[in-house]
Amino acid sequence: MGSPMHRVSLGDHWSWQVHPDIDSERHSPSFSVERLTNILDGGLPNTVLRRKVESIIQSDPVFNLKKLYFMTREELYEDAIQKRFHLEKLAWSLGWSEDGPERIYANRVLDGNVNLSLHGVAMNAIRSLGSDEQIAKWGQLCKNFQIITTYAQTELGHGTYLQGLETEATYDEARQELVIHSPTMTSTKWWPGDLGWSVTHAVVLAQLTCLGVRHGMHAFIVPIRSLEDHTPLPGITVGDIGPKMGLEHIDNGFLQLNHVRVPRENMLSRFAEVLPDGTYQRLGTPQSNYLGMLVTRVQLLCKGILPSLQKACIIATRYSVIRHQSRLRPSDPEAKILEYQTQQQKLLPQLAVSYAFHFTATSLSEFFHSSYSAILKRDFSLLPELHALSTGMKATFADFCAQGAEICRRACGGHGYSKLSGLPTLVARATASCTYEGENTVLYLQVARFLMKSYLQAQASPGATPQKPLPQSVMYIATQRPARCSAQTAADFRCPDVYTTAWAYVSTRLIRDAAHRTQTLMKSGVDQHDAWNQTTVIHLQAAKAHCYFITVKNFKEAVEKLDKEPEIQRVLQRLCDLYALHGVLTNSGDFLHDGFLSGAQVDMAREAFLDLLPLIRKDAILLTDAFDFSDHCLNSALGCYDGHVYERLFEWAQKYPANTQENPAYKKYIRPLMLGWRHKM
């Protein structure tokens, strides 16, 4: 287990004595927490390096996070900018490479409280969509911060539907320039991070027109502000969109372009280019221009979305062994609230989700890296599957992490409503992920189209090997399975093959039913597009089931690989069982629909689920400790490693500046009101 010095880093005078209620949870562990941390990090060397980086960050006063809860929005923005450029100087002095693990670990401990994250997204787009010459030019400028960029895709009137983007890029062959223009109010770029006050350039997504022919969405590098005094350039209207639900430190912005001219060479041209005479040449597929967004989406899973749920689990679980409420028996002292089955039922499934998603993200990352280099070489055979997997997992991660973080917040009662708990910030960030980089429902429906296409491909040659093999992730839909679950007892439902088969069966049935319903409507004369729209609710249900099956399968396979770590394998197997069964019980109607499960079998699954709760509860603190987020990173009065919740809440509240300042409302309103009533009396 990591040392208390590593984990406790807030400098409070009581931090070196761990509260006995949480200390007892760590006695006689059933597995090595340190070894599990190494597994989650991808090996001991990674853990060592991560902690070294975190120690450097946490010892630097510029990176302090404790004052964030008391700052204004403008102060939060300036603080986040200061942190980013201090980090760049530090990285340069220590020789950290742009894409090295040190950067990832530094951002992990800073918990997203640095700005210019869209600078990295824009660099991803340049590396993915730019030619070698463009990468050499623009990539170096970005790397050296000679320019600061953002990725400007979303518009006031369009988001996830990229074909509907209205911003225009018209090629002027006489001057060999591209004219970038916002023709309508709704074509205003809206939401790009860092655009409001910070960036000098933007990778702008716009509809390309050459010689009067429209060629769809492409990416263009457009200067936004002067490199001399940071004022907007001619034809540019730019600013901040105003207050938001969360992410107050980020200057999300708007951008209007009034016939702004850029050189022809500013169009990113790995997969398409415009020749000087206006001839358009496509070097890839129409979907190639989504590659930059796909890269960002894969990175978001582990670095941007999942940590919110992991941290929420740590905070809520630690608080739940410190908080005592009511009695299990009249003669007993008040019990830790984690002893109550209802609290376990809230929190432990979220812990299971955190682990399931970690191993799923690892699997997807491996698939991404194995296919990305091929795509850059214009081999697009794996692009549809990679798009479907990344899209489905982004939607699934965002949905479950937002819901789970909120469940954790509510599980902490009133204290979870305090920003000092850290939970409202985590909930707001997870909630934002449900709409940025694609609105989740739209993303699920993109997965559904892929599933329907794959299902029809499988049905074209039933019982035979199809001419074109099915993508690996959907091969299960062509497999014949029993129409009834084989489980006879509650214990049977803790067999991975039983619940994995159950999820594969239900997912396949829902995909089949959605495809058949769409085809039936089309055969009855309904237009193809209308038929799709009239069945999207069914397709959405199928896509969600497919995504859940993928996560169950990935978790199961990850646990199976831990056969040389029997203690860890045992505890993770319980979490895997809980994750799969929680999904079955939450969606029991889908399993009962055609009799795959009987009512009695659902009762057995519930019994198995409830039996798992006390087993996992014994290891709950250790399982959250294994995520190895330091107190600095959690920045939570409720979730510190030492368990001194109430002392920390009280001390942090004393630091609120308003508590030591004169209250202007007293003289202006309260005192006159009180005096007025006294005179009337």
Curated annotation (Swiss-Prot):
Q: Which body tissues produce this protein?
A: Most abundant in liver. Also expressed in kidney. Not present in any other tissues tested.
Major localisation:
other
| EC supergroup of this enzyme | oxidoreductase
Residues bearing Phosphoserine are 3, 9
Which InterPro entries does the protein's record reference? ACO, ACOX_C_alpha1, Acyl-CoA_ox_N, Acyl-CoA_Oxase/DH_mid-dom_sf, Acyl-CoA_oxidase, Acyl-CoA_oxidase_C, AcylCo_DH-like_C, AcylCoA_DH/ox_N_sf
| EC number(s) per entry | 1.17.99.3
Q: What is this protein called?
A: Peroxisomal acyl-coenzyme A oxidase 2
Write down the species: Rattus norvegicus (Rat)
Q: What is the lineage of its organism?
A: Eukaryota, Metazoa, Chordata, Craniata, Vertebrata
